[in-house]
């Protein structure tokens, strides 16, 4: 009975390998028993050798629970979003550790012992004031590494040699120069946001397995042809850069499924962008686009198109040829009217044309579109009218208050 009570009220998940096989439980779905008024660290004293999964995230911990070092069979340890300042060198004793998540703490240094955890598959030490990391060359099973938002000024060579890596996030570092990434040939996902780049790092063209690439919040002025030619690329995010034009070679991005190029300096877009065979999500918001191509092709497979916060004054009627569209945003442009034929978009669910100076809207045609669930049609003129009405109403209320106080 005593063992049952202790197990019921513990913070952590206690699984034996036999239980895990019986329940067919995956590593990324640990059982979580939450009781905020319990002392989670105390639970570590209960058969620590049987513990394989621990989640102490968001527990306001200021120190690494030293009792954890007794959990020699632990496979997953999560200590994210606390106020831990250091990791003990003794962490090397957790030889079976496969997943270590210690992001968003106050850790200033990573012990050398962490580099000897050869079973590690996933490591997240992001968002800590760390300025150096140990030699990771022994972590040959590591396939996910997040070292974003650290104080690193260089990326260690030991990381650049980890051919097992599939997912690497090196965003928001303090790099003075960017290394060649060509050795990381097995990368599927790469994040280099907020790196003050004016051009992409060398070796990108060698990452032939890369599927997701994000390089937002940089100073890029163009998209290199080599990136568009990556044979496996599906998701490309280049938002908040200084890109002024899209190359005609965009037509070579035949595998692209999602493209986010919002927050740049585009004034036009090539028609080839709309004919990409697999492109379904396109975000062109917050640019300076004045016109769209007149000859948008009928074979477009776009489902989501965001053109909000641009400078469009007219839309081509051929836009309605994008018959796969389910979400379309034209909010905050300079549109005064819409071309006829919008009812051809029979799959459209969300349509936002608010904050435009419309003089006329084909409202009857829009209302025949049975698939529409969300329509935003408030114009700039309407907003200004309501604002003026609000000011007038406020003035009236102010003028009658003295009378109300006097009981008149």
Outline where the language-model segments fall.
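Leucine-rich repeat
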Residues: 48-49, 69-73, 92-97, 115-120, ...
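Bacterial Sec-dependent N-terminal signal peptides
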Residues: 1-25
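Leucine-rich solenoid repeat scaffolds
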Residues: 339-408
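Solenoidal tandem-repeat scaffolds enriched in leucines and small polar residues
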Residues: 132, 143-199, 203-222, 234-245
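LRR N-terminal entry segment and analogous cap-like coil->beta motifs
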Residues: 29-34, 44-85
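Conserved hydrophobic beta-strand positions in leucine-rich repeat
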Residues: 31-33, 52-56, 77-79, 97-102, ...
């Amino acid at each position: 009975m005593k063992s049952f009570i202790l197990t019921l009220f513990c913070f952590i998940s206690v699984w034996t390998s036999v239980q895990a096989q019986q329940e067919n439980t995956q590593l990324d779905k640990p059982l979580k028993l939450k009781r905020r008024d319990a002392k989670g660290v105390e639970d570590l004293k209960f058969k620590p050798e049987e513990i394989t999964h621990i989640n102490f995230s968001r527990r306001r911990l200021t120190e690494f629970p030293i009792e954890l070092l007794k959990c020699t069979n632990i496979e997953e340890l999560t200590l994210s979003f606390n106020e831990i300042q250091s990791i003990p060198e003794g962490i090397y004793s957790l030889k079976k550790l496969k997943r270590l998540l210690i992001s968003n703490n106050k850790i200033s240094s990573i012990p050398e012992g962490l580099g000897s955890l050869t079973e590690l598959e996933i490591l997240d030490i992001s968002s800590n004031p760390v300025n150096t990391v140990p030699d990771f060359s022994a972590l040959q099973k590591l396939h996910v590494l997040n070292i974003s938002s650290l104080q690193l000024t260089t990326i260690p060579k030991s990381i650049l040699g980890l051919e097992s890596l599939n997912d690497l996030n090196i965003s928001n570092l303090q790099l003075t120069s960017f290394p060649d990434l060509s050795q990381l040939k097995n990368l599927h996902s790469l994040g280099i946001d907020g790196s003050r780049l004016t051009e992409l790092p060398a070796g990108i063209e060698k990452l032939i397995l890369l599927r997701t690439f994000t390089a937002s919040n940089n100073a890029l002025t163009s998209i290199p042809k080599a990136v568009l030619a990556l044979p496996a690329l599906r998701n490309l995010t280049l938002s908040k850069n200084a890109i002024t034009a899209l190359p005609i070679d965009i037509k070579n991005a035949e595998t692209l499924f999602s493209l986010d190029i919002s927050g740049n300096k585009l004034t036009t877009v090539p028609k080839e962008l709309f004919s990409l065979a697999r492109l379904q999500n396109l975000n062109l918001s917050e640019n300076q686009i004045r016109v769209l191509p007149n000859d948008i092709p009928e074979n477009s497979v776009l489902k989501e198109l965001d053109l909000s916060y641009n400078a469009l004054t007219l839309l081509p009627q051929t836009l309605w040829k994008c018959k796969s569209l389910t979400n379309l945003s034209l909010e905050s442009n300079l549109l005064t009217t819409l071309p006829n034929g919008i009812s051809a978009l029979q799959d459209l669910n969300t349509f936002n044309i608010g904050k435009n100076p419309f003089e006329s809207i084909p409202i009857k045609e829009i209302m025949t579109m049975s698939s529409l669930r969300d329509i935003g049609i408030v114009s700039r003129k309407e907003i200004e009218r309501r604002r003026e009405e609000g000011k007038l109403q406020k003035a009236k209320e102010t003028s009658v208050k003295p009378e109300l106080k006097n009981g008149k």
